């Protein structure tokens, strides 16, 4: 008698297809969530990629836009930054496309438990455009797909005109070099101003204004020396 073997679940079958063929053949893991995703106002990854590739100057999802996406984790890797905090690169795919997410310590503190291969997740964050690269998403929060019902539709928002101020005593302050290093992890086109108090001079820089960036700067320079000016 041939022993009975439990049938694979749909999710297991799809994962096997992806592993062996390099693509999903009989469907996509996000198919069963499509209606709920639409009701929640989730932005399709393909829409972000298409908008980025468009030659139009007026973007629907510009640098710094806040969006929520949902998809399955294709891969992830975590490393420790020079400021001794964790940073993860996550490849997320929905049924319209795939994009890279970057999650820092703040998002990982509550969301790392959900980052598993083939796991469906919801990610809220800010779009980061850099040079000719495809857009990335700087994650603010990572949640399980079961939280879909708790989401309310909302349009993408930007704070493109905001300015981030950091105050230092002078140019010889060793923290200036640390700030420059931190900024390399938050590429973007939003304005940051470092005010050198003794010299009464300003240094301008461009970055993606992100909660994790603000948190890192406050830890380095003190809460009173970091200020977000929202226009």
Q: What are the roles of these predicted feature ranges?
A:
Residues 1-231:
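Noncatalytic, beta-rich nucleic-acid-contacting surfaces in large DNA/RNA-processing enzymes
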């Amino acid at each position: 008698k041939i022993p009975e073997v439990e049938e694979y679940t749909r999710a297991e079958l799809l994962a096997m297809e992806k592993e062996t063929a390099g693509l999903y053949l009989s469907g996509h893991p996000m198919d069963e969530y499509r209606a709920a995703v639409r009701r929640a106002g989730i932005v399709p990854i393909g829409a972000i990629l298409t908008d980025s590739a468009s030659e139009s100057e007026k973007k629907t999802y510009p640098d710094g836009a806040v969006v929520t996406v949902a998809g399955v984790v294709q891969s992830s890797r975590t490393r420790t930054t020079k400021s001794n905090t964790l940073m993860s690169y996550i490849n997320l795919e929905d049924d319209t496309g795939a994009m890279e997410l970057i999650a820092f310590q703040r998002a990982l503190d509550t969301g790392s438990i959900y980052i598993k291969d083939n796991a469906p997740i919801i990610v809220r964050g800010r779009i980061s455009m850099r040079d000719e690269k495809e857009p990335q998403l700087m994650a603010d929060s990572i949640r399980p797909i079961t939280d879909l019902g708790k989401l309310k539709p909302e349009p993408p928002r930007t704070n493109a005109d905001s300015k981030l101020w950091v105050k230092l005593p002078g140019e010889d302050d060793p923290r200036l070099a640390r700030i420059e290093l931190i900024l390399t992890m938050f590429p973007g086109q939003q304005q940051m101003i470092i005010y050198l108090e003794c010299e009464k001079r300003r240094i301008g820089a461009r970055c993606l204004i992100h909660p994790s960036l603000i948190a890192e700067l406050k830890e380095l320079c003190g809460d009173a020396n970091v200020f977000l000016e929202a226009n």
